[in-house]
Amino acid sequence: MSLHQFLLEPITCHAWNRDRTQIALSPNNHEVHIYKKNGGQWVKAHELKEHNGHITGIDWAPKSDRIVTCGADRNAYVWSQKDGVWKPTLVILRINRAATFVKWSPLENKFAVGSGARLISVCYFESENDWWVSKHIKKPIRSTVLSLDWHPNNVLLAAGSCDFKCRVFSAYIKEVDEKPASTPWGSKMPFGQLMSEFGGSGTGGWVHGVSFSASGSRLAWVSHDSTVSVADASKSVQVSTLKTEFLPLLSVSFVSENSVVAAGHDCCPMLFNYDDRGCLTFVSKLDIPKQSIQRNMSAMERFRNMDKRATTEDRNTALETLHQNSITQVSIYEVDKQDCRKFCTTGIDGAMTIWDFKTLESSIQGLRIM
């Protein structure tokens, strides 16, 4: 495991470039900072300043090397690098509330933006007019959209929202997409078609994170009632929900076809297993607890605590986990969702951690990624 303390401020969101030599993150304000790996150090290389509201989402397209950002100013920008300088292009989202989340499609020819306007803007480039335009998916969303993930076929889109529901929509755009083949989620896919809807019948909570598996036939989501759920379209959309004893999870990702990693307010990642019988189980916390050591506080730590915790007391308030506050995002760091070797987390403590499954398997007894 490698932990890097980027900031004293929270990291709102992050995205990696293709070869993982650069990371784009937002320090809980209207800017995006791009850090470059230089030996063992991370050095700030660029600052992207165009938004005038808090940035809420960043995604970095690996093949085309474009960054898309969205924010509370109701705007999205596509950033392209020319001669070492990042240039923004405004995207017309046509929303009257903050944008909350953004995600490139697998083919990078469109992206989706969730918002507080109870809709999803699916944006694509119109070459004859030389600008990015959007189409809206509105019905039957009844509240803020918090999370999105694309199906590998570049057409289906999963969305989690504050109306306690997780939904799968068709985001087929005839201008840029080829006619999609039939999937276990359905065969008719006109734009905006609701393919599946889960949750919200009197129970549940805000859906903070969603993730398709590498095959696209499974969908995982985490809700504010501390549940993890997986729907399997290959088993006639069978849903398995696990009520955990932890604080709510905020982000989720498949790391193999049968394994899911989620993290949130408990400050450490958790591993869950979904077997071929459709049974969802909790496997382990993926953190190696540090032994607390009683020691005198240095002057440096005293000043740091004044800054971070508004206290100069020397009582040890450090958590036993690597992250010292809620984890807000989980992303794949090495390989992909089919066979993840390493994953990355960022959190409210301003830290970024890269987790290595090989190291975790050797230090946590009985742990194996299925």
Curated annotation (Swiss-Prot):
<keyword id="KW-0963">Cytoplasm</keyword>
<protein>
    <recommendedName>
        <fullName>Actin-related protein 2/3 complex subunit 1A</fullName>
    </recommendedName>
</protein>
<comment type="subunit">
    <text>Probable component of the Arp2/3 complex in which it may replace ARPC1B.</text>
</comment>
<comment type="similarity">
    <text>Belongs to the WD repeat ARPC1 family.</text>
</comment>
<feature type="repeat" description="WD 4">
    <location>
        <begin position="202"/>
        <end position="241"/>
    </location>
</feature>
<dbReference type="GO" id="GO:0005885">
    <property type="term" value="C:Arp2/3 protein complex"/>
</dbReference>
<dbReference type="InterPro" id="IPR036322">
    <property type="entry name" value="WD40_repeat_dom_sf"/>
</dbReference>
<dbReference type="Pfam" id="PF00400">
    <property type="entry name" value="WD40"/>
</dbReference>
<dbReference type="GO" id="GO:0005737">
    <property type="term" value="C:cytoplasm"/>
</dbReference>
<dbReference type="GO" id="GO:0035861">
    <property type="term" value="C:site of double-strand break"/>
</dbReference>
<keyword id="KW-0539">Nucleus</keyword>
<dbReference type="GO" id="GO:0051015">
    <property type="term" value="F:actin filament binding"/>
</dbReference>
<dbReference type="GO" id="GO:0034314">
    <property type="term" value="P:Arp2/3 complex-mediated actin nucleation"/>
</dbReference>
<feature type="repeat" description="WD 1">
    <location>
        <begin position="6"/>
        <end position="45"/>
    </location>
</feature>
<dbReference type="GO" id="GO:0098978">
    <property type="term" value="C:glutamatergic synapse"/>
</dbReference>
<feature type="repeat" description="WD 6">
    <location>
        <begin position="322"/>
        <end position="365"/>
    </location>
</feature>
<feature type="repeat" description="WD 3">
    <location>
        <begin position="140"/>
        <end position="179"/>
    </location>
</feature>
<dbReference type="InterPro" id="IPR001680">
    <property type="entry name" value="WD40_rpt"/>
</dbReference>
<keyword id="KW-0853">WD repeat</keyword>
<feature type="repeat" description="WD 5">
    <location>
        <begin position="244"/>
        <end position="284"/>
    </location>
</feature>
<keyword id="KW-0206">Cytoskeleton</keyword>
<keyword id="KW-0677">Repeat</keyword>
<comment type="function">
    <text>Probably functions as a component of the Arp2/3 complex which is involved in regulation of actin polymerization and together with an activating nucleation-promoting factor (NPF) mediates the formation of branched actin networks. In addition to its role in the cytoplasmic cytoskeleton, the Arp2/3 complex also promotes actin polymerization in the nucleus, thereby regulating gene transcription and repair of damaged DNA.</text>
</comment>
<dbReference type="InterPro" id="IPR017383">
    <property type="entry name" value="ARPC1"/>
</dbReference>
<feature type="repeat" description="WD 2">
    <location>
        <begin position="50"/>
        <end position="89"/>
    </location>
</feature>
<keyword id="KW-0009">Actin-binding</keyword>
<dbReference type="InterPro" id="IPR015943">
    <property type="entry name" value="WD40/YVTN_repeat-like_dom_sf"/>
</dbReference>
<dbReference type="GO" id="GO:0005634">
    <property type="term" value="C:nucleus"/>
</dbReference>
<dbReference type="GO" id="GO:0036195">
    <property type="term" value="C:muscle cell projection membrane"/>
</dbReference>
